[in-house]
Amino acid sequence: MNDFLSKDDYEEPKCLLNMHPEVTSIPVGRIIDKLDFYLSRNDHDAAERHLRYWLSEAESCHDMRGKLTVLNEQIGLYRKIGKESECLRAVSDALSLADSMDIEQSLTYGTTLINAATGYKAFEKAQEALPLYRKAKTIYESALDSNDGRLGGMYNNMALTLTELGMYREAEELYQKAIKVMEKQKNGELEVAITYLNIADLISARDGLENGEKEIEKQLLEA
């Protein structure tokens, strides 16, 4: 297992010592491809170093969009490997950067909000996550086609947070919306099944296993 950055990781656009203040874009596509390679090998240490390196490069290059992309990837990585303080720092940095970029109505902003909310939710901060999901929902519903699969994923994640907060009616409404979207996706059957299982969990949390037995069984049969 290679624990060090290879030349391929850093040979493209690099702003040495910030001597060139003009904006130069970091190679986002290659960065994500290399990240996926490290994750496919469960080489999380290399993945962390990879993202830290390119975060520094984006800052040196004044590439704020590239920096936001790297921060979003850091949120996902640190959430995956359970590094709470690092994840929450990336969440804070991503939200601050996005707020400074005049992109409030863009899908990029909406996606950043969802990633940040998911990061909060992963570390038992559902209260902090919910307002971010609400803002993202407004953006996604305005910018995306009503059958776009990204909406289904957002509805599901937001509903999980609502369930954790005991807001069951709104959560169930979003689960039903998620099902309608995911039923129209190619190979969406798995996501639909997962959503029915989530509804069963909601009923169990709301009514208890005994009182909700029949309704839970119904959802499990749908799944």
List PLM regions with ranges.
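Short coil/turn linkers that connect adjacent helices within long alpha-helical scaffolds
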Residues: H20-E22, S60-D63, S100-E104, S142-S146, ...
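Amphipathic alpha-helical segments of tetratricopeptide repeats
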Residues: L55-E57, L95-S100, K137-S142, I179-K184, ...
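Alpha-helical segment of the N-proximal tetratricopeptide repeat
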Residues: I26-S56, S60, G76, K80, ...
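Alpha-helical solenoid repeat scaffolds, predominantly canonical TPR units
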Residues: H50, A90, L97, L132, ...
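Conserved alpha-helical positions within TPR/SEL1-like repeat arrays
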Residues: G29-S40, T69-K80, L107-A122, G149-E164, ...
